[in-house]
Amino acid sequence: MGKGDPNKPRGKMSSYAFFVQTCREEHKKKHPDSSVNFAEFSKKCSERWKTMSAKEKSKFEDLAKSDKARYDREMKNYVPPKGDKKGKKKDPNAPKRPPSAFFLFCSEHRPKIKSEHPGLSIGDTAKKLGEMWSEQSAKDKQPYEQKAAKLKEKYEKDIAAYRAKGKSEVGKKGPGRPTGSKKKNEPEDEEEEEEEEDDEDEEEEDEDEE
C-alpha cells in the first residue's frame, strides 16, 4: 500500500499503539544499552494495559483521536501516484502472499470473539487477538507456524513457476517465433497445467484468508 511513496500520510495509531510506544521509550531510558525481547515486551505491555483504569487510558485515547483527525485530514489532500494502482493491479493472476502464523490464528479465532463480543470494534478485536496470541505457548503456536511454513513453501514454488511462465511468454513474442513452432506447443501444455495449479492455489489461500 504505497510503501514506496514518501508523500503518503503516516498511518493512524490506536490508543494501545501509543501506549506501547510510551512503554518502549520508557524501556530505552531505563535500559539504553539492552536489546528488547519483543515477545516478552509485548506480553508485559498487554498485561499492563489490562490493569490500567479508564482514566489512565484516556490520555492514550485522546492521542489516538487527534492522530486519526490528522490522518483523515492528510488523506483528503493526498493524491496517490498514477502508477501506484496500476502496479498493484497489473498481475491479478500472481500467486497471493501466504498468511503468517498469527494471521491463521486470527482467522480461526476472530468469529468466536465476534460472537462473544458483537459490539467490539475492529481495532479492539485485533488487540484482543494480539493478546490471545501472546498468551499462547510455543506448543500451541506450533500448528499455525507449521501451516504457515507449508503455505510459504508452496507460495515460493508458485511464484517461481509464475515468474518463469512470464519469461517464457516474453520469449515467445520475441524474434525467435518463426523457428520455434514445435517448441512453442510444449511450454504451452506446461503453462496450462501451471495455470490450473495456480487457480487451485489461489482458491485454497482464499479459503485460508477467510
Swiss-Prot record:
One of its GO terms (molecular function) is chemoattractant activity. Residues 165-180 are annotated as: Required for chemotactic activity. Disulfide bonds join C23-C45. It is found in: Nucleus; Chromosome; Cytoplasm; Secreted. This is High mobility group protein B2. SMART domains: HMG. InterPro entries: HMG_box_dom, HMG_box_dom_sf, HMG_boxA_CS, HMGB. Multifunctional protein with various roles in different cellular compartments. May act in a redox sensitive manner. In the nucleus is an abundant chromatin-associated non-histone protein involved in transcription, chromatin remodeling and V(D)J recombination and probably other processes. Binds DNA with a preference to non-canonical DNA structures such as single-stranded DNA. Residues 51-102, 162-210 are annotated as: Disordered. Reduction/oxidation of cysteine residues Cys-23, Cys-45 and Cys-106 and a possible intramolecular disulfide bond involving Cys-23 and Cys-45 give rise to different redox forms with specific functional activities in various cellular compartments: 1- fully reduced HMGB2 (HMGB2C23hC45hC106h), 2- disulfide HMGB2 (HMGB2C23-C45C106h) and 3- sulfonyl HMGB2 (HMGB2C23soC45soC106so). Residues 51-76, 162-172 have a biased composition (Basic and acidic residues). Gene3D superfamilies: High mobility group box domain. It comes from Rattus norvegicus. The keyword tRNA processing does not apply. Interacts with POU2F2, POU2F1 and POU3F1. Component of the RAG complex composed of core components RAG1 and RAG2, and associated component HMGB1 or HMGB2. Component of the SET complex, composed of at least ANP32A, APEX1, HMGB2, NME1, SET and TREX1. Directly interacts with SET. Interacts with LEF1.
